[in-house]
């Protein structure tokens, strides 16, 4: 998992900075259209016509579903990578704040860049398109043929890091089911590769439906766990805030706050500062 994290540490920021830079260039070139685009976003989101037609509810539903694929907030997958990180200050709450920042950057910056790229496009027929083709067409209208190639390359890199990372997430949980052995890993790897093959061959609506169901179940289980662990979350957060307010060295100790259950590794937060 650490090797994957190191790989993503270089690839993901490069992709993100490149994508945001291109979006900024497109926005600056079309700066005169930006006010009308922002107005269109607001009126479309809160317009009475859309609300009356049920389009608002449909947009919220679709936004939540697709938003989870983007930032994975609340789904319980990213904490696997967060658990392998070395936070500074040396406290679980500080890593939690980092994860919150990641959701903000992904949603409010990267997704907003995509929205601007699409809405600033002036090509005809874009309203009938959806998904990656919509973004490719909009980028091509701004930058020519290289725009479509840029989006394809970015998607390939994002998809590759996602596939590799999610494999590691699943593999790290095998020990919870007492399957962290050669046979268990072999079955898991075979099943994972089989799902990738099926996903590449199945129709897009079926893939979306299957993914929506799986991600929904993940999120449901994780949210239930978060609710159950609320006392621990509050205690750990208060411990972090109190130490920061008192200008103490912020390190985590199980003795400083009450947590539910027991840590699987007692020294997990030692020697990481």
Residue ranges and their predicted role:
Residues 1-34, 38-42, 208-238, 242:
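Membrane-interface loop-to-helix entry segments
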Residues 2-12, 97, 118-188, 204-221:
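Transmembrane helix-loop boundary segments of multi-pass membrane transporters
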Residues 8-11, 21, 25, 53, ...:
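Hydrophobic alpha-helical transmembrane segments of multi-pass membrane proteins
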Residues 18, 49-68, 109-112, 117, ...:
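Select transmembrane alpha-helical segments in multipass membrane proteins
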Residues 22-40, 48-50, 54, 83-89, ...:
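Extracellular/periplasmic helix-exit of transmembrane alpha-helices
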Residues 72-81, 88:
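Transmembrane helix boundary and interhelical junction motifs in multipass membrane proteins
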Residues 87-105, 180-189:
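Membrane-interface alpha-helices at helix entry/exit sites of multi-pass transporters
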Residues 223-273:
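Terminal cytosolic tails of multi-pass membrane transporters
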